Each structure stands twice: as C-alpha cells, then as structure tokens.
Amino acid sequence: MPNRKASRNAYYFFVQEKIPELRRRGLPVARVADAIPYCSADWALLREEEKEKYAEMAREWRAAQGKDSGPSEKQKPVFTPLRKPGMLVPKQNVSPPDMSTLSLKGDQALLGGIFYFLNIFSHGELPPHCEQRFLPCEIGCVKYSLQEGIMADFHSFINPGEIPRGFRFHCQAASDSSHKIPISNFERGHNQATVLQNLYRFIHPNPGNWPPIYCKSDDRTRVNWCLKHMAKASEIRQDLQLLTVEDLVVGIYQQKFLKEPSKTWIRSLLDVAMWDYSSNTRCKWHEENDILFCALAVCKKIAYCISNSLATLFGIQLTEAHVPLQDYEASNSVTPKMVVLDAGRYQKLRVGSSGFSHFNSANQEQRSNTPIGDYPSRAKISGQNSSVRGRGITRLLESISNSSSNIHKFSNCDTSLSSYMSQKDGYKSFSSLS
C-alpha cells in the first residue's frame, strides 16, 4: 500500500492546527481524518496569503522527508523548499479566471461588456459543525454595463425552510439586526427551486455560454453556498461562475491604465453610504418599512460605485441608470451660504484665540448691520496676514466712513473707545491708532 504520510499538504497542517479547537467544542476528533469534514468551510474562508503559511509548512515537511530533491518531481523552481520566508517568491493572486472571462479588447469591449452583480441574504450564519450553514431569505441581481448603466434587475424573497432546532433565537437576532425579514410565516417568500429557476432565466435568457456572476469578496462564501443549496431542490443544476467585484474592478483598471490598484482602495471605493437611502435602490418591501439592509440595494450600489468611479474615466455621460442623479448632484454641490458661515466661524475663532475678547461685541454688532453684499469681502479679508485687531478696526472705520449719515455716531464711538482703551496697560488710545 502507498505511504499515506507522503500526501501531507497545506490543508493537512491547517486541519492539524484546528484539532484542539474542535475538541473544545466537544466534537469527536481523534485524528486528522476525523477533523477534515469540520474544517472545509473555514479553509474556504482563508485568503491566499493565509494559506501560504500552511503551504510553507507542507514544503518544509516534504523537504525533511527528502521528497523535493528527486528529479521525478514536476514542481516549479519557485516552490522548492526555502528556509527563509523573505526569500519566498510571492504568487500572483490576481484571480486569473476573472481576467480570462472578461475577454476585454479595448475601450469598446469594456464599455459594452455585460456584468451581473448578485447577492443573497441569510438568516444569520450557523456554526461550522452544522450541515446547513446559511438560511437564504432574499436574493437580488442586476444586469449592468459601463455604457448603459443598470439595464435590468431581479429580486425575490426566499422561503428559508425549516429553522434548525436550537437556532431559532440565533436566526431571529441576526434578522433583527440587519434585513429584518421574518424567519417564518412570511407571505412574500417563494420556493427555493422556483427562485433559482427565475434567476437562471434572468442571467441566461438565450442559449450560449453562461456569463460570470460577481459579488463582493466578503459575501462570496455565503452566496456560493446558498446557490449550491438551492440547486439541490431544483431540477436544473448549473454551476455558476461566481467571481468577485474587487477582481473585476482591478481587471478594468489593468486593461485601461496598465497598472493594478490596491485591493484596499477598491474595497473603500465599494463601501460607501451616500446612496443608502436613494430612491429606487432598495426593494419595495424594504423601502416601505424603511430598512437599510436589502440584497437588491447591495447590487445596485455596486453599480453606482463603479459608475461614479469609472464612467468619467471613459468619458461616459452619467444617467439615471448609472447613479441616482438627484443624490449625486446634491452630494457634489456646495452652497455659497455654507462657505460664508464657515468664514464667519473662522474669524470668530481667531478673535477668541488672540486674546482680544473686548472687540467681540463690537464685531458682532457690525456683522448684524452689514448687508448681504458685504459677505464676499469679509471672506476675503479673513485670508489676509494682518492681525485680528487691525482687521476689526479697519472694517469698523471703512463701514463708518461709507455711511455719511453716521458721522455723529462715529465721533461718539471714537470718544467711548478712546476712554475705554486708555484704561488698559500697553494699549494706545483710539485716536493715536487712527
């Protein structure tokens, strides 16, 4: 019989590391083979750089067994055992399937390409040892292109089926904290097989190759599991190619600018809140109940973010199909009144911090008597390099000199200010300053 120890790979060492945790849960795991069924879901959630740790452990083990030095091994040179982690050649993690399925040649192919954004909500997430990890309750999908924007959308509530025993409170709490869809007796929920068949007809109405489907990387495990779970109850089984939106945006940037943006920047681009309450974004039920979390809204906001970021780079005129124009224009407009208020606040802060608090009452009285047309000059004066006390006196003198009817009032003000400032140590009289 072959030597079973020779088949140790990265997954073997990952399972070996998880055994103590599984035993603390009370699971009957005596060896690695017993723990493998409980670790597959956690392994799928790991990123490539996290899996590299266990791959290195497997390479070191094979090196110790003398398996890597033989000429019959058909491994690439970059995967030979290296003791120093700094010498490891990093693997390219740009998701090659994403780039090959795009088949983009030039800007016209980018603009005319059709993309489907999908999301499925669940009543929480059950522990890894449970056979049913998720309970799908809502699905949303949009058909999108850079040129046309959102071309069509699909939405449906899903009957999650029977809640596993002992997890009803857990599922109810997860629902109440997010989408608030009832976990049972929800009249809008449809059969899982029917929903999946309707989704297939939406994304693949004509014969031919099935298009790739995109979702956020954080939702990929849940969406992929729900699709396979729903396919079990359907007579039509189709393995959809589920890719990540982050890799799609990276591919578009690489095609257009020949350089790759960071995944952190891509995630910050997609995680925005400016369209959370935009009209025609959430489904009708979530809109009527004023609930923020909606599967259809997640898909539409992905399209909004991509349009907002990439459409201008391709010279596309934004329409209602790209972004909610009313909210988009409101978020990019600045009213002059806001600028004036900020300028006034800035001047008041500068006056208070400079120690000349005795000019505050005079300045406030002057501002209340200043017409609206003087606001731009005030905002301009605040950027000069003169002292705050000098600016205040200058504005006072200019406004008084422009009013010929207030000459008598000016003489009274001169006398009062002179008598007041003569009492302060280190200050000259008002007449000497003028």
UniProtKB/Swiss-Prot annotation:
* Name of a matching Pfam family: Maelstrom
Q: Where is this region: Disordered?
A: 62-94, 357-385
Q: Which GO terms describe its cellular component?
A: cytoplasm; nucleus; P granule; piP-body
Q: Mitochondrion among the record's keywords? A: no
What processes in GO biological process is this protein linked to? cell differentiation; male meiotic nuclear division; negative regulation of DNA-templated transcription; piRNA processing; regulation of miRNA-mediated gene silencing; regulatory ncRNA-mediated gene silencing; spermatogenesis
Which Gene Ontology MF annotations are present? sequence-specific DNA binding
Could you tell me which residues form the DNA-binding region? Answer: 4-73
Protein name, UniProt field = Protein maelstrom homolog
State the UniProt keywords alphabetically: Cytoplasm, Developmental protein, Differentiation, DNA-binding, Meiosis, Nucleus, RNA-mediated gene silencing, Spermatogenesis
InterPro entries in the record: HMG_box_dom, HMG_box_dom_sf, Maelstrom, Protein_maelstrom
Per the record's keyword annotation, is DNA-binding included, yes or no?
yes
Biased composition range(s): Polar residues: 357-371
Job description of the protein: Plays a central role during spermatogenesis by repressing transposable elements and preventing their mobilization, which is essential for the germline integrity. Acts via the piRNA metabolic process, which mediates the repression of transposable elements during meiosis by forming complexes composed of piRNAs and Piwi proteins and governs the methylation and subsequent repression of transposons. Its association with piP-bodies suggests a participation in the secondary piRNAs metabolic process. Required for the localization of germ-cell factors to the meiotic nuage.
Q: Where in the sequence is the signal peptide annotated?
A: none
| PANTHER family membership | PROTEIN MAELSTROM HOMOLOG (PTHR21358:SF4)
